[in-house]
């Protein structure tokens, strides 16, 4: 049994006093009772659905609030954090000690004199590199969310649990002094890396707790040579590990969920001396337009103990997954064991030998697959390119490019080159190969079929792509296979998908120019300058 007096003393040390009751690491059964009990109002209220899962609403914040993210500027962080600047804008905005203290007072005052849920868990399935996290909240479903998403400790581990990091969620409190303090709004998500505390105020979005700890892992791990990656990962029958990087909508979750392979995790991983390990104990999947036919694993994971966010629940308790009226970013969190085909008992495996960068190129320029050199690996990892098709007022669909460093710029706490260095070092030590896979469009105007993309992934994973005869794509100087089993050969060279190759040429020159322009921000040191040669020639 955990000593609750010890927990209360630790809360007092944080500035949380006169707690009415501590509900410590509640069971799923208890959480279900707490979040559906009569009398709950507003965003605290959970609704039971016919799936067996409880649904909650997060209010106006149906996604993360990057404009309200701050890190305390101090001796520890001033030369390590990748601070936002005019030349390279990002979400790491500095906060002074006085402002931090006033926010901490607001949150601790909000949590004092209340009945609190305290959930202890781990971030990271590696004993050496995990962080012991304590989450303190007055809201039952927020405790449920973190129980789903972090790694659940054993009774034995809880006996001597010492938190390395504390998340204090004060979603009910806002900051009245934000204007004088020069902040973005009355809401805040603030981190103090010296005190090892995250404060949340004003936003009820569950993902702030998950991605907050990801940002923390992204700070501490690379500084000791351990990879911290925004990727999914799976392992084959022979123990061969693949990792899939990609921004939202590129196929990261879909392509790593493979009946022939066991899932390590779907979103956040580390790479240490033993191999690849999941940071999380659960999954946080998008549910918009979810169907059993298209994504059976996720669909079946939505049952008792899963927690739905911002979905529309009909009068009879059924869920309308096609209704995006609250947000397109409808979500579900569930413990990872709700998926059958997973690595057990610990979400970790050996070193990755295949590293796949997924991009959905709406310009129709990039090949469906290319093999990268070590220099190209760093270049395309730092570029983190994808593109969406957005309709314009005249009905023309224009591609909008996104360049997100390391396929996860929103969560990087250190300079992107540090993640690239660790990744390539780990890859070289493991003899891993890297591939750029375009799940987007080509000259036909259609999206590359999921059948062809799965065929490409199979060829990478079974090694047959290594035996393929290779050609080279000009401008980008990418190595592309001439034929792959189970893949339509007519699409492998994107130039062949255009009625007129000159069309590809002009689009390729346009896209190459965008890559070059984006990469300027990395050419501020010698290493960055050296990588320019690995990129496209504008």
Curated annotation (Swiss-Prot):
Record-listed ATP binding positions: 211, 230, 246-254, 295, 331, 447-448, 453
Entry function: Involved in the gluconeogenesis. Catalyzes the conversion of oxaloacetate (OAA) to phosphoenolpyruvate (PEP) through direct phosphoryl transfer between the nucleoside triphosphate and OAA.
Pathway noted in the entry: Carbohydrate biosynthesis; gluconeogenesis
InterPro entries: PEP_carboxykinase_ATP, PEP_carboxykinase_C, PEP_carboxykinase_N, PEPCK_ATP_CS
Keywords: ATP-binding, Cytoplasm, Decarboxylase, Gluconeogenesis, Lyase, Manganese, Metal-binding, Nucleotide-binding
GO molecular function: ATP binding; metal ion binding; phosphoenolpyruvate carboxykinase (ATP) activity
Family listed: Belongs to the phosphoenolpyruvate carboxykinase (ATP) family.
Source organism of this protein record: Haemophilus influenzae (strain PittEE)
Pfam family, one: PEPCK_ATP
Designated name of the protein: Phosphoenolpyruvate carboxykinase (ATP)
Entry binding sites for Mn(2+): 211, 230, 267
Catalytic activity: oxaloacetate + ATP = phosphoenolpyruvate + ADP + CO2
PROSITE patterns found in the cross-reference section: PEPCK_ATP
Biological process according to GO: gluconeogenesis
Location(s) in or outside the cell: Cytoplasm
């Amino acid at each position: 049994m955990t000593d609750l007096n010890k927990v209360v003393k630790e809360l007092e040390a944080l500035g949380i006093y006169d707690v009415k009751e501590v509900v410590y690491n509640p069971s799923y059964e208890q959480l279900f009772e707490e979040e559906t009990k009569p009398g709950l109002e507003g965003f605290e209220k959970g609704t039971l659905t016919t799936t067996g899962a409880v649904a909650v609403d997060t209010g106006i914040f149906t996604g993360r609030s990057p404009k309200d993210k701050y890190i305390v500027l101090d001796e520890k962080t001033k030369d390590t954090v990748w601070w936002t600047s005019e030349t390279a804008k990002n979400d790491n905005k500095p906060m002074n000690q006085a402002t931090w203290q006033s926010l901490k007072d607001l949150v601790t005052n909000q949590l004092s004199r209340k009945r609190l849920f305290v959930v202890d868990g781990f971030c990271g399935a590696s004993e050496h590199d995990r962080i012991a996290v304590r989450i303190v909240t007055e809201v039952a479903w927020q405790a449920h969310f973190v129980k789903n998403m972090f790694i659940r400790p054993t009774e034995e581990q809880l006996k001597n649990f010492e938190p390395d990091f504390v998340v204090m969620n004060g979603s009910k409190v806002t900051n009245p002094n934000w204007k004088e303090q020069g902040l973005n709004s009355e809401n805040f998500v603030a981190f103090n890396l010296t005190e090892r505390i995250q404060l949340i105020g004003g936003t009820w979005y569950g993902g702030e707790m998950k991605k907050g700890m990801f940002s923390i892992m992204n700070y501490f791990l690379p500084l000791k040579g351990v990879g911290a990656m925004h990727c999914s990962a799976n392992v084959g029958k022979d123990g061969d590990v693949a990792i899939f990087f990609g921004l939202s909508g590129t196929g990261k979750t879909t392509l790593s969920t493979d009946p022939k392979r066991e899932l390590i995790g779907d979103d956040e991983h580390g790479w240490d001396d033993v191999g690849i390990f999941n940071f999380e104990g659960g999954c946080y999947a998008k549910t918009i337009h979810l169907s059993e036919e298209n994504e059976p694993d996720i669909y079946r994971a939505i049952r008792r103990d899963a927690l739905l966010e911002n979905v529309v629940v009909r009068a009879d308790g059924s869920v309308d997954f096609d209704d995006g009226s609250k947000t397109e970013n409808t979500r579900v969190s569930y413990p990872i064991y709700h998926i059958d085909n997973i690595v057990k008992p610990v979400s970790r495996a050996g070193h990755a030998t295949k590293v796949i960068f997924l991009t959905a190129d709406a310009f129709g320029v990039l090949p469906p697959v290319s093999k990268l050199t070590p220099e190209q690996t760093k270049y395309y990892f730092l570029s983190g390119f994808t593109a969406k098709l957005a309709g314009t007022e005249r009905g023309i669909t224009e591609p909008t490019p996104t360049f997100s460093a390391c396929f996860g710029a929103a969560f990087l706490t250190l300079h992107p080159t540090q993640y690239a260095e660790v990744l390539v070092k780990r890859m070289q030590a493991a003899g891993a190969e890297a591939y750029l896979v375009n799940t987007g469009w080509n000259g036909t105007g259609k999206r590359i079929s999921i059948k062809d993309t799965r065929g490409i992934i199979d060829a990478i994973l079974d090694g047959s792509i290594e035996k393929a005869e290779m050609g080279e794509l000009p401008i980008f100087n990418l190595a592309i296979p001439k034929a792959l089993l189970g893949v339509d050969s007519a699409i492998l060279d994107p130039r062949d998908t255009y009625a007129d190759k000159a069309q590809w040429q002009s689009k390729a020159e346009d896209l190459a120019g965008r890559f070059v322009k984006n990469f300027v921000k990395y050419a501020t040191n010698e290493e960055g300058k050296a990588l320019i040669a690995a990129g496209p020639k504008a």
